[in-house]
């Protein structure tokens, strides 16, 4: 299943491991984000007197607090509550350094004080939301196969917790009105709409009378929602999709077909969708420029415990992922498309410790060049990410 490593990947990995003096990208001032109405406040993204400016968007994969992750958060809080921020501190410069930062919140939250559960029916501490906000996330999508693990109450608690800390959200809803609104975010003088959908909910039916509780994948609906977001004032539309085959490095046929169809969507001369961000497979998958729209088939897991395949074997790929970073440049004329002027990825790993810590894999490999597991993860992530020709389209590993 492991892709053949192209020469470009080998060169990039070798250069990275040799460049111990290179540091992480310089952080920009933090963006002010999400209000209880899921609309981020203008901050760095406010237009300058000379007009719109370029902005950066980062996106990460599944936040999946298994029981051992919950226990680590309790230990990090000294036994009093839950602190998920220490586990994410290693990637905070990357997240907070972007104008917009998007996460995928895989699970729903339990009531304050618990009880909390991991796999198979997740119920996470609501303190996760504060940690995500403090790390620098602007918005999280909440459409996944675990969205209905605790029914409508789980959705309500999750979105209430996000509202309380000012974290925007999209993909699940407490009422029909909320379901009809995308997350509208601001950066570079642009309004960015985020939409989110999942392939299913683990066989749990949508709650009676609540067909809008979680967005399910439907090509025509996604395109219609994207056009509605444009009508609501969005300059760019980002679609987060929970799809794919778990433990498969390569995108499946549904992913490839849907990506082509969504990227081909057009209303007049404007593309309907500007960026597609995939989650669910638990492993990193390829990036590809599809009909001028960058598509990330699978980001992998941002935060998870020990990961096991269906046959019971522990698989380290479940703790490897990529951070997508795209720089969008203003259109040459009003009404035209914002374009990606720089496309980058950052390899990431959850080091299982103890303690559990999410790390920028570039920095971790520079600090500990003798770690064979870091070198192996770096090589694999790079190989998979570039396996569908993204390097030729301009994608690079961030220096």
Give the residues covered by each predicted segment:
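Bacterial N-terminal signal peptides that target proteins for export
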Residues: 1-11
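C-terminal motif of bacterial Sec signal peptides marking the signal peptidase cleavage site
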Residues: 18-21
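Acidic, metal/ion-coordinating pockets
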Residues: 2-3, 23-399
């Amino acid at each position: 299943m492991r892709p053949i490593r192209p020469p470009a990947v080998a060169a990039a990995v070798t250069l990275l491991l040799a460049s111990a003096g290179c540091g992480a990208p310089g952080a920009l001032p933090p963006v002010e984000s999400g209000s209880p109405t899921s609309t981020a406040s203008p901050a760095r993204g406010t237009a300058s007197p000379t007009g719109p400016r370029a902005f950066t968007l980062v996106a990460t994969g599944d936040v999946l607090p298994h029981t051992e992750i919950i226990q680590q958060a309790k230990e990090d809080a000294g036994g009093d509550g839950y602190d998920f921020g220490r586990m994410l501190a290693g990637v905070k410069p990357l997240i907070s350094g972007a104008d917009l930062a998007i996460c995928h919140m895989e699970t729903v939250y339990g009531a304050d004080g618990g009880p909390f559960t991991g796999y198979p029916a997740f119920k996470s501490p609501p303190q996760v939301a504060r940690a995500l906000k403090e790390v620098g996330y602007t918005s999280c999508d909440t459409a996944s196969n675990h969205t209905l693990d605790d029914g409508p109450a789980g959705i309500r608690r999750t979105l209430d917790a996000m509202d309380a800390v000012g974290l925007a959200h999209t993909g699940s809803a407490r009422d029909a009105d909320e379901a009809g609104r995308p997350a509208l975010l601001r950066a570079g003088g642009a309004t960015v709409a985020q939409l989110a959908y999942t392939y299913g909910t683990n066989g749990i039916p949508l709650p009676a009378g609540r067909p809008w509780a979680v967005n399910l994948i439907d090509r025509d609906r996604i395109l219609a929602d994207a056009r509605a977001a444009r009508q609501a004032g969005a300059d760019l539309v980002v679609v987060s999709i929970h799809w794919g085959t778990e433990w498969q490095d390569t995108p499946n046929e549904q992913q490839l077909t849907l990506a082509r169809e969504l990227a081909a969507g057009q209303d007049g001369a404007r593309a309907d969708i500007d960026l597609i961000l995939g989650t669910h497979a638990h492993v990193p998958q390829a990036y590809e420029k599809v009909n001028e729209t960058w598509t990330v088939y699978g980001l992998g897991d941002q935060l998870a415990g020990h990961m096991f395949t269906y046959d019971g074997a522990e698989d380290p790929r479940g703790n490897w992922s990529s951070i997508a970073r795209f720089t969008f440049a203003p259109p040459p004329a009003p009404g035209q498309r914002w374009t990606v002027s720089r496309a980058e990825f950052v390899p990431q790993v959850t080091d299982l410790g103890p303690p559990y810590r999410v790390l920028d894999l570039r920095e971790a490999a520079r600090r500990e060049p003798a770690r064979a597991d870091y070198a192996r993860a770096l090589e694999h992530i790079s190989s998979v990410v570039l396996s569908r020709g993204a390097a030729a389209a301009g994608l690079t590993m961030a220096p």
